[in-house]
């Protein structure tokens, strides 16, 4: 340390620190050694791994190489075997016969060689025998020569055996020195002369004197013949070289005797084969050899062959019977054709080539029997059908191998061609009756029909019997008798078959049952239709309101025949002729099968002054009259015509769309109705529009497809409002533009209306009932759309809002479209004696006073249904209107917009609760999405009070997962189902936070709801936008009455001075149209109740009877 005086330290006072001690764990040498050891370990470790990997790879490569070599060897061997087999397989019967001849020649040459060798050996061993070595005889004389040789040898052996020799002398050296030879091949002897008598004399003298075998002279002793290696091997093989003489002689005798029995049989078999071969050559037909030749057995010892002797008697009998054709059941003319073809050799049976080595099992036998029966029935019926209807196919045989397989394979594994000709006829059923209405035809040009010209035809009519009967070929006399017996047709039981079954064959053209020429086909009497079908028939005319005033279904009366001449406009009764199915053109059906019966509905109509309109269809002319009100406003008539055209084009477009899966399309919902009969009048009840509403979950985005180019629906379909915000001050201009458009169209059609009025005046005093043809012939003539009542008959009025018992003045334009002038004639305004909304708000100061005014306006009872929007947009829709909080916020001291709307409308309509039930449904959550709704009460049903509704909402809302998108259609259909079940008036209050994403589906649901006693009120909560809702409320021209109303909650509340004032304003603007909608529902017959008075009548009564 360096000392510095400025630090102020004294060096003497410093403490000296001891030097630190260093402890080394390993010395330097140790460290070097450890490093070297580590490096060496790593080196050897990786080397070991490398060697191991190489070893494993080498082991893998070695078996791979061996496998490849084995496969290569196997392939070469297989190739050699294949070539060897192909070389020895005979190609035809001629080659087999040639091989057989060659084989016999080789065998004959071998036999002659063996005989020559045997004769030489016999001459050497038996000097006393004189053997004829002339072997130039042909093979045909071999049997005779063999008999001569055998006789000579037997005689010689017999004489030698009967010599008077002692037992010891029998084993003399001369017999021991002569070894017996047992020839291996078939040895044939020639002519041996008898043994000389001196041999017998010398032996007798020797035995008589010496009582022992006499000495034989050396020149008389037969010396052993030198045996070649081949003979030596032959002797050892038969093991007779050391046998005693008498045993050897006995064996020679036995073997010669066997040869005498076997060889002639082989020769005889060969001769028979040659004769058969010559006969086949003379006939020009070669029949394959069923028994393989000896050369084939020798060359291919492993090749299996089929022996027909192994078949059971039943199988052999069936096999033999298949070679015959039974034509006893054929129609006249067919038997002669088949017999001629059989005589010419066209039906020669084909011998089956089979390769079996064992007998069939019992199960296979049963399967074969079933298959034979089925195949016999099929072929018999097929041929019968073809011949009876002058059709057929080529007369060709099946391939022999395919027939052999089909004969012995199970039925499930057999495939055959149904268009094979008569060459494959199988045993037939004893009786196959013909069709009663088709005479027996003649067979013509069967072989000219080809598969490309054939069509499917059902031949199942001819399965008259289950079990087949087998016959043999009959004589021409028997054929003629059978043909005469089966000329008379008989009735048969017909059954249908599918195109996949084996009963179908192909014919050249369809076969129809035409009536006899010169007789007209009887016209089938139309069947009566049920009231349900009648109601569905009426829906075709009034689904989109084509201008027919049909109050109900009249009793079905007589059948109306199609007009032959032009009818006059004067008719007794209107006849609505409607075919249940889509009928083709009438002229196109005159030359075809008699058409299906048509349904005739006679519907009485009220007598009006009508204008005849002529409609011509081909040669038949129809005249019908469509009623037109002379006093209708031309603007309304032109507008109605525009609407009717829109509806027709909409229906035509929707009919081309097919349903997707099992979903319920809204077009189908719009057309379903169910009639109900009352005591004195007919009632039509609409069917459930959505059937299982919430249980059948269908995505509306998939079902209700948006049509981007809807040229004729631009008045209600406004896609531009989804991307362009329309200021509120411009909405009135939009509505006025629509009215101006109606005025323009009305002015253009005014001239046409005047012309129709002139025609109507000419027929004003006549009583006309119109005959209307098919609905497709009708054209709109300016009638406003009208809808058939769902629960009762409509009153006799031409207006959708008119009343028969009221003023007799003409129908005003407001009656046709009341929603355009509803506020000017509101019943609430008339009851309160005010003329504007501001005056009404000043007159109504509480919800109770509003309820009393609605009761005076004619509202009797109603039921509430709440729809809660649970889409995810509720989270941010309250940025401006609800302080940035979610619209579904549940807090003890804060009331969200949903709770406020439920409370306000519930308190207002509580005095009108008819059934005391309040339905609460949610939509747009994660589970239901935009294709269904769910009940907040669960399976418990509806709520009983307003407090219960609020409690259920407060309990369920925190547990619901918000999702989307927004779609009102499922909720509207659920409300329609409730109305149908309860048959009571309902008000559906939909509380939503934004416009719907599927505008087209919602619009259709709103239009469909007009057929039910249902009013729809949409209360918009949140920041909006609400452009689409305003369009819905102002411009839905397809509705016969205004069933939809929209109010914006926050727009009303923020203009209010206090909370109570805001509640009253919301209730007034929400329920302003309810009394008038209720009156419209009663007038249309949707409710079987008394019709409340109009606003004008209420005002008139108040003026005459002031308080």
UniProtKB/Swiss-Prot annotation:
User: Does Transferase show up as a keyword for this record?
Assistant: no
Q: Where is the composition biased (Polar residues)?
A: 687-698
Q: Where in the cell is it found?
A: Basal cell membrane; Cytoplasm, Myofibril, Sarcomere, M line
Summarize the record's disruption phenotype note: Embryos stop elongation at the 2-fold stage and have defects in the organization of the myofibril lattice. pat-3, deb-1, pat-4 and pat-6 are slightly mislocalized in the post 1.5-fold stage. At the 1.5-fold stage, unc-89 and myo-3 localization is normal. However, at the 1.75- and 2-fold stages, unc-89 and myo-3 are mislocalized into large foci within muscle cells.
Provide the residue span(s) of the region labelled Disordered. Answer: 478-501, 673-698
One example GO MF annotation = protein-macromolecule adaptor activity
Q: Which keywords does the record carry?
A: Cell membrane, Coiled coil, Cytoplasm, Membrane, Transmembrane, Transmembrane helix
Q: Which residues point to the Extracellular side? A: 1-22
Q: Which residues lie on this side of the membrane: Cytoplasmic?
A: 46-1107
Show the coiled coil region(s).
67-124
- Coarsely, its chief localization is membrane
Biological processes annotated in GO: positive regulation of sarcomere organization; protein ubiquitination
Which cellular component terms (GO) are annotated to the entry? Answer: basal plasma membrane; M band; nucleus; striated muscle dense body
What does the function comment of this entry state? Involved in the assembly of dense bodies and M lines during body wall muscle development. Acts by recruiting downstream of integrin-associated protein pat-6/actopaxin several dense bodies and M line components including unc-89, lim-9, scpl-1 and unc-96 to integrin-mediated attachment sites.
Tell me the protein's name.
Answer: Copine family protein 1
Which species expresses this protein natively?
Caenorhabditis elegans
Q: What is the lineage of its organism?
A: Eukaryota, Metazoa, Ecdysozoa, Nematoda, Chromadorea
